Each structure stands twice: as C-alpha cells, then as structure tokens.
Amino acid sequence: MSLFDHSVSELHKKLNNKEISVTDLVEESYKRIADVEDNVKAFLTLDEENARAKAKELDAKIGAEDNGLLFGMPIGVKDNIVTNGLRTTCASKMLANFDPIYDATVVQKLKAADTITIGKLNMDEFAMGSSNENSGFYATKNPWNLDYVPGGSSGGSAAAVAAGEVLFSLGSDTGGSIRQPAAYCGVVGLKPTYGRVSRYGLVAFASSLDQIGPITRTVEDNAYLLQAISGLDRMDATSANVEVGNYLAGLTGDVKGLRIAVPKEYLGEGVGEEARESVLAALKVLEGMGATWEEVSLPHSKYALATYYLLSSSEASANLSRFDGVRYGVRSDNVNNLLDLYKNTRSEGFGDEVKRRIMLGTFALSSGYYDAYYKKAQQVRTLIKNDFENVFANYDVIIGPTTPTPAFKVGEKVDDPMTMYANDILTIPVNLAGVPAISVPCGFGANNMPLGLQIIGKHFDEATIYRVAHAFEQATDYHTKKASL
C-alpha cells in the first residue's frame, strides 16, 4: 500500500506520531516516479536534490505545534507556474531553458505551509490544448490506459496524481484545463472563482480566464490545498478581496434541501450516452440524500465554444507577443535583421497549436474585424454570465458531465482541431462566467476509462461545491478506484 493512498489528514497524523518521516514521503514520490515515469511522462523537471534537503530539514521539526496540515506533503507544480531557480518551460521550446528568479504567489504560499515541490509537470504548450499532445517535448499518457490521453492542458498534473507519483498537484484552468484532465484521469480537480487565487507568477494564456487550482485524490484534500493558496494578493490586480472561508467546515455529508439545476444543454446534443447516464445516476444518489433537482436552460451556452476561442486566442496573441527573441526565451541564430529575429524566433520556438491561436487572435483584433468578432464575443460572454446568474437566483449548484465522453486514444483527434476543441464544450462556459466548478469521479465508460461529474457554484461559493462533491464522494466508491499502472 502506498503512503499516498492515505489522505492529507491521515498522513499529518502519522507524521505527528512519528510513524513516518517527511523523507519517507519524498522517497515514496521519487520511487514511484522511477517505477512509472518512463510510461506516464507526467514530469518535465524534477527537483530531487532540493526536495531531499528540505525533507531532512522538516524531519527535525516533526511534532512541532505550529506544523500545519500540509507540512511535509509532496506536490507537483504545472510548468506554467514559475518556481524560483527551477526550470519553467510552459512545455515549449520557446522557454526550454528558462529559470525564473522568483516564485509565483501560490508557490510562496505552499512553501510557507512547508510543502515540498517534487518537480514541474508536463502540459500542452502554453496551456493550449485538451490532450497533452501539444507539449513541445513529449506527450503525457493516461495512467488508466497508456493508449489514451490524460486530457489537457494540465494533463501532467492529473496523471501524476492518478499514477500516485505525488499526493496532489497544481494546475491552471482557462477553458477546462483542470477539470477535463481530472475527469479523464479519475481524480478531483477544482477551478476556483476568477480572482479567488492569485495569478501572479502564472505565465499568461488568456488573462481574463486563467485560474490556478488544485488536483487531488479526494475532495477533502482538494479543500485543504485551496485553503492554502486562496486569498487577496496585491501583486495581482485581478485578485479579489473576498474572505476565504473554512472549506473543511462544510464537509459534513449533508445535502438535505439542496437545490440542484441540471441544464438541458449539458445532457443534449454532443454529449455521449455514458456521460449522460453517469450524471443521472449521480443525481439519484444526491436525491436519495435529500437534495432536489430540476431541468433548466443555459440558452447561450451553445455559443460558448466560438466565444471562448475568439476571446482566449485574442488574449493569447497579446500575451505571447513578448516572446520575440529580444529578452525572453530562445533566440534564433538564423537572422540578418530585426524582422528576421522576430519571425524566425517565433517560427522556431512555438508549436503548431500556439501558432494557430496566435493567428486567430491577431485576426480577431485586427482593424476592420475587432467590432465584428472580438467585441461581439465579449457581448456574448456577458449573456453567458447572465444565464448563470439567472439560474443561481433559484438554485444552489448546477450539475452536469465534465466532458462529453471518456478519454480518447492518443493520436485520435490531433489532426482535427475542431473535434479536439469540442472536448471542452461543457467546461468553457464556466470560465466565461468566472464561476467556480469541480470535477469528481462518477463512473467509468468504455475500456474502463473514468468519467467526471461537474458541480458548478455561485461566485466565491466554493464551500457549497465542496459540500456537494464530498457528500457524493462519501456515498460512492469511485474515488477509491486506482489506475492499475
């Protein structure tokens, strides 16, 4: 039995009782990585020397009264979250040798909580992708079946947790990039409310959509991690000055009287039968615990995919303009003038999907097209946000599938961008509205691949999401299933 089969609270108790050491936890992580990483390929960079030194330092503090619940816990960090002195590449050749000189705010907070960073996790390049096949280095595989994708863009973050390489991880979510891989890999992933968690130190893809969030084995562990990384940060102008409640207090298993909305659009066209049936079964479980549910409509969600790709690509076009060979990242040697430097550096440094989105965004922002595309997309975004607010006026949470289907095979959709984009049709509206949502395991589909239940909440009401997710988790055993890697 792996130490990582235990929850954070159980491991914390074992540490305090000196049944295990922090070094034991770190070695457990690196041993598992040595055993499975050649197949899973979840990590891009390991930090073994520093992790072992930190573990030895923390071992001397075991039993101290001020040790928090995350004391000594091994974590993996998505490779678009900067880590001081530890290579951060965004899975792009553009940043292949970039060593940051500061820590992201979330990393600072986790260091203050005495977690130990095991390494940096693979992803789709600059977080653009839904399968991890867009990594500039190599594709991560799904621990449940190595022939299948782990999802993206936080595929490495989800796969590492599912494979037992780390206890938990950090990912980022712009259009579903935490929740979708969490669903595909049978783990728990939460996208917080926009502004709940600081984005300082997150390499920007689409600044109005990006959020950092936790990926874990259980809902309780997820709540611990969000508690640690949430809160106002003066270094991030979009960070919200909203009180962070006690997320653990609501994990009672009680959902009696809870009002659940189920959008008909989330169970309709484009959603597979396996995903639909798993959600209906989950609703029966919650109904049996005293919750009620009704069908509702989010009428503008059908426009979410087009809206998202116009807006996110436009923001990406602006954000990635800084990578030009002058200051950040690689620099092409094949140059005769400044124009060559810009063109050749970006042509050589960026992958195909990143180039595709930069082109789309530049087009949408160009003279003559701004009003026709970008401005109208912003107006539709407002309508989508209003749809959610209208539903939340009468309901506590919205529930549906996280993804239309279970994970697909490696290489199956890589040559068809539109089919690939459609994997995120159920997660994208949440980012456009800025509301929080979690994916929890809710069953299995074809070839024993996991399915996820998406629970969406009101702005800054992560507590209710956790309450529902925890109650469902405790009433089922999906979270106890493990990939037999």
From Swiss-Prot:
InterPro entries xref list = Amidase, Amidase_CS, Amidase_dom, AS_sf, GatA
Q: A Gene Ontology MF term for this entry?
A: ATP binding
Which keywords does this chain's UniProt record carry? ATP-binding, Ligase, Nucleotide-binding, Protein biosynthesis
Q: Has UniProt tagged this entry with the keyword Cell membrane?
A: no
Q: What class of enzyme is it?
A: ligase
Which Pfam families is this protein grouped with? Amidase
* Catalytic reaction annotation: L-glutamyl-tRNA(Gln) + L-glutamine + ATP + H2O = L-glutaminyl-tRNA(Gln) + L-glutamate + ADP + phosphate + H(+)
- What GO CC terms are in its UniProt record? glutamyl-tRNA(Gln) amidotransferase complex
Where are the active-site residues found?
A: K78 (charge relay system), S153 (charge relay system), S177 (acyl-ester intermediate)
Organism domain of life: Bacteria
Q: Does the keyword Lipoprotein apply?
A: no
Any one of the GO BP annotations: translation
- Catalytic activity, EC: 6.3.5.7
Record HAMAP family: GatA (MF_00120)
Q: How does it assemble?
A: Heterotrimer of A, B and C subunits.
State the family it belongs to: Belongs to the amidase family. GatA subfamily.
- Task of the protein: Allows the formation of correctly charged Gln-tRNA(Gln) through the transamidation of misacylated Glu-tRNA(Gln) in organisms which lack glutaminyl-tRNA synthetase. The reaction takes place in the presence of glutamine and ATP through an activated gamma-phospho-Glu-tRNA(Gln).
Question: Know the name of this protein?
Answer: Glutamyl-tRNA(Gln) amidotransferase subunit A
UniProt lists the gene as: gatA
